[in-house]
Amino acid sequence: MIGRLHGKIIEKQPPEMVIDVQGVGYEVLLPMTSFYSLPQVGEEATIFTHLVVREDAHLLFGFAQKQDRTLFRELIKTNGVGPKLALAILSAMSVSQFANAVENEELAKLTKIPGIGRKTAERLLVELKGKFKGVAQSDFFEEHSVETIVATHSHDPADEARDALVALGYKLADAEKMIKKVNKAGATSEQLIREALKASL
């Protein structure tokens, strides 16, 4: 199991990055909540990882904080929630927002996330309710500052933001509408994604 990577960021294309660790480039998928805090391309970063082994691929998922990975691991244990859906959940909400939604049984909030219908949302409530109460504060609710968002190398931030939302499970038409609502001159793709996700909840 690869649990942690430290190296130089050589590519950033939401929701994916490539990190060079001693000459080996690892492709890593990150939730947008973690992607926002990445430093610039060319700078060093440390990410916590979870390796998913499938018949057709080995997928590496990365997280800025341990508590994000802890929640990811809880989510993929839930029946009907795969790694891609867990990534979409963590992109739409912070760990504390998700925990509050589950503890307060806010079904409507959960069903706004792409890929989560009423049945899946109900299953999440049943299987995860109460789990957050016994978890150590440091595991789930560690406060951390988000670094300044840095523009990624892109021809059109709006197109890049739209593609990232599609990669997270949104339909193309919905992603285009979401970006159109928040698009403004000078905004980076990461800012547009953040605003679009915030507006959708």
Swiss-Prot record:
GO cellular component terms, A-Z: cytoplasm; Holliday junction helicase complex; Holliday junction resolvase complex
Annotated compartments: Cytoplasm
MF-aspect GO terms: ATP binding; four-way junction DNA binding; four-way junction helicase activity
Region (Flexible linker): 144-154
Chain segments carrying region Domain II: 65-143
GO biological process: DNA recombination; DNA repair
Pfam family, one: RuvA_N
Major place of residence: cytoplasm
Swiss-Prot/TrEMBL keywords: Cytoplasm, DNA damage, DNA recombination, DNA repair, DNA-binding
Position of the signal peptide: none
Annotated stretches, region: Domain I: 1-64
Function, as annotated: The RuvA-RuvB-RuvC complex processes Holliday junction (HJ) DNA during genetic recombination and DNA repair, while the RuvA-RuvB complex plays an important role in the rescue of blocked DNA replication forks via replication fork reversal (RFR). RuvA specifically binds to HJ cruciform DNA, conferring on it an open structure. The RuvB hexamer acts as an ATP-dependent pump, pulling dsDNA into and through the RuvAB complex. HJ branch migration allows RuvC to scan DNA until it finds its consensus sequence, where it cleaves and resolves the cruciform DNA.
UniProt note: domains: Has three domains with a flexible linker between the domains II and III and assumes an 'L' shape. Domain III is highly mobile and contacts RuvB.
Oligomeric and partner information: Homotetramer. Forms an RuvA(8)-RuvB(12)-Holliday junction (HJ) complex. HJ DNA is sandwiched between 2 RuvA tetramers; dsDNA enters through RuvA and exits via RuvB. An RuvB hexamer assembles on each DNA strand where it exits the tetramer. Each RuvB hexamer is contacted by two RuvA subunits (via domain III) on 2 adjacent RuvB subunits; this complex drives branch migration. In the full resolvosome a probable DNA-RuvA(4)-RuvB(12)-RuvC(2) complex forms which resolves the HJ.
NCBIfam families, sorted: ruvA (TIGR00084)
Family of the protein in this entry: Belongs to the RuvA family.
Identification of the protein by name: Holliday junction branch migration complex subunit RuvA
Species whose genome carries this gene: Actinobacillus pleuropneumoniae serotype 5b (strain L20)
Gene encoding the protein: ruvA
